[in-house]
Amino acid sequence: MPPKSRTAAGAKKVRRKEKKNVAMGEAHIKSTFNNTIVTITDPTGAVISWASAGTVGFKGSRKSTPFAAQMAAEAAGRRAMEHGMKKIDVFVKGPGSGRETAIRSLGAIGLEVGTIQDVTPTPHNGCRPPKRRRV
């Protein structure tokens, strides 16, 4: 099979990032035991910016720290503020250690935090949980 060559017609199309002017939005913080992911959307749910502890530069077990969650929230919040965001409602999901620090850092960079809701999914005795960890 001949190697694929890139031509002008077959080149990847890169979409330009357009400046959305959104004053109010939602911050979805997913905090697991291993990582923290912060996604900022407009009220309809379209993603404006996102960051995780891994994209900010933390690797391995350092991703699960509250400081990594703080840095991820600041990075996502600053990118959202470039699009004109001023006020956010926060939705927190998961049991991780970076929940509170992520919320605090969103307020510290200048975003006005409105409501804070915990949307962690809890089973009505559905799937069997993983076995207990023995160290």
From Swiss-Prot:
GO aspect biological process, one term: translation
Entry's Gene Ontology cellular component terms: ribonucleoprotein complex; ribosome
Gene Ontology MF terms in the entry: rRNA binding; structural constituent of ribosome
Region (Disordered): 1-22
Keywords noted in UniProt: Ribonucleoprotein, Ribosomal protein, RNA-binding, rRNA-binding
UniProt-listed InterPro entries: Ribosomal_uS11 (IPR001971), Ribosomal_uS11_bac-type (IPR019981), Ribosomal_uS11_CS (IPR018102), Ribosomal_uS11_sf (IPR036967)
Family designation: Belongs to the universal ribosomal protein uS11 family.
Record's subunit section: Part of the 30S ribosomal subunit. Interacts with proteins S7 and S18. Binds to IF-3.
Role description: Located on the platform of the 30S subunit, it bridges several disparate RNA helices of the 16S rRNA. Forms part of the Shine-Dalgarno cleft in the 70S ribosome.
HAMAP family: Ribosomal_uS11
Protein name: Small ribosomal subunit protein uS11
Organism: Nocardioides sp. (strain ATCC BAA-499 / JS614)
Gene: rpsK
